[in-house]
Amino acid sequence: VIGENAVKQLSLGGGSSELKPQKEISPLEGMIEKYGKEHILFTLGYASGEPNYSNELPSGLDADSLVQEALKVAREADVVLFFGGLNKNFQQDCEGDDRRSMDLPFGQNELIEKIIQVNPNTGVILISGNAVSMPWLSQIDGLMQSWYLGSQAGTATANIICGEANPSGKLPFSIPVKLEDNSAHYFGAESYPGVNGTQYYKDDILVGYRWHDTKKIDPLFPFGYGLSYTTFQYGKA
C-alpha cells in the first residue's frame, strides 16, 4: 500500500461543514483488517502538508526520500495498491479557489509512473471529489474511483478490493481526457477565467456529457460509466 490518502483523514471537512467522527477507518486500516498486518507493507510515497484552506503548507518531509522509499516497497511487494487523488486542502477539493490544474498534485502522476516501472502489478485507488488526469491509465491493472466515503471508507474500500462487495456505482459526470475538452475552455477568456471579474456561461445547457456528445469529443470515462465483478444485460421483464 502506497500513498498518503491511505492514511489521511478525509471525512472531517472544515468550517461550517466540519465533522468530528468518533472513529474514521482509513483505507490502510481496512486493508490490514482484511489481509493481516503481516501481509501489508506501507509507505507514504508523497505528502501534502497540514490541512489548510487559505494557502498551501509544506509537509516538512523530503519528497525525493518518500519516492525512493515507495519504489523500495513496490519492488518488494507482490501487488501495489496506490491510494492517491486529492484532499480538502487549498486549491484542491476546497471552497474559495480553483485547482491549479487537472493533474494529480504532489508529483503523484510521476510517482505512479515510476512505481509501474518497478512493479507492473499495480492498481490505483483515487480518493477525490472531482476528475483528474490519468496519463498512466493504460499501464495499470485496475482503477477504482473511491470519492470521499466518510468514516467507514477503509472498510468499504477493502470490501470491494477483496471481493466481498460488488462495485456497482456509476459516474455522475464525464471525466475528460484533458481540461480543454470541457465546454468552459472552448469560448476563450470570457468563459474562463473571465474578464474583469465576470464570467460568461456561453456553453448554456451544453455542459458535461451534452458538450461531449454535441462536439463529438470522446471522454476518458463517460457519464454513467462503471464496471463491476459481474455482467448485466437489459431485456424484457
Name each model-derived stretch.
Residues 1-15, 20-28, 32-41, 51-58, ...:
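Secreted, periplasmic, or luminal enzymes acting at the cell surface/secretory milieu
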